[in-house]
């Protein structure tokens, strides 16, 4: 699995709200830090499933867009833009994943930074692409 395939799997797992599919993208001993202030991070498949089960349980109509990843060896960074209903409220979450991959292509370390805004907002022009213009 290469980074682009991993990112597509993550996008699909989120839209389908599938904790098991998400966990399959990670090594058995992975560290998943969904916030820079989360201590301790979610660890391993059990930690990923537990986090995703709680985080996605109130989400509906999830639409995830992933930007163009920046890849350097076994590291990648990618922006994401998500619109959904959460507990009935329309919201937009925008964030970035910092990823380190194991040799088999699964993620062994994820660090996530994100922002929240009310309403269903579209990405701004140029979002998700780091290509020089």
What are the roles of these predicted feature ranges?
Residues 16, 20-73:
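A solvent-exposed, acidic/Ser-Thr-rich amphipathic alpha-helical stretch
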């Amino acid at each position: 699995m290469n980074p682009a395939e991993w990112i597509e799997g993550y996008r699909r797992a989120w839209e389908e709200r599938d904790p098991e599919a998400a966990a399959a993208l990670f090594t058995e001993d992975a560290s998943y830090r969904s916030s820079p202030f989360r201590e301790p991070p979610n660890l391993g498949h059990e930690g990923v499933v537990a986090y995703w089960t709680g985080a996605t349980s109130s989400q509906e109509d999830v639409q995830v867009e992933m930007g163009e990843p920046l890849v350097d060896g076994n590291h990648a960074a990618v922006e994401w833009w998500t619109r959904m209903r959460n507990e009935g409220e329309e919201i937009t979450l925008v964030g970035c994943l910092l990823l380190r991959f194991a040799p088999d292509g699964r993620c062994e370390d994820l660090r996530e930074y994100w922002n929240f805004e009310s309403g269903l907002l579209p990405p701004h022009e140029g979002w998700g692409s780091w290509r020089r213009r």
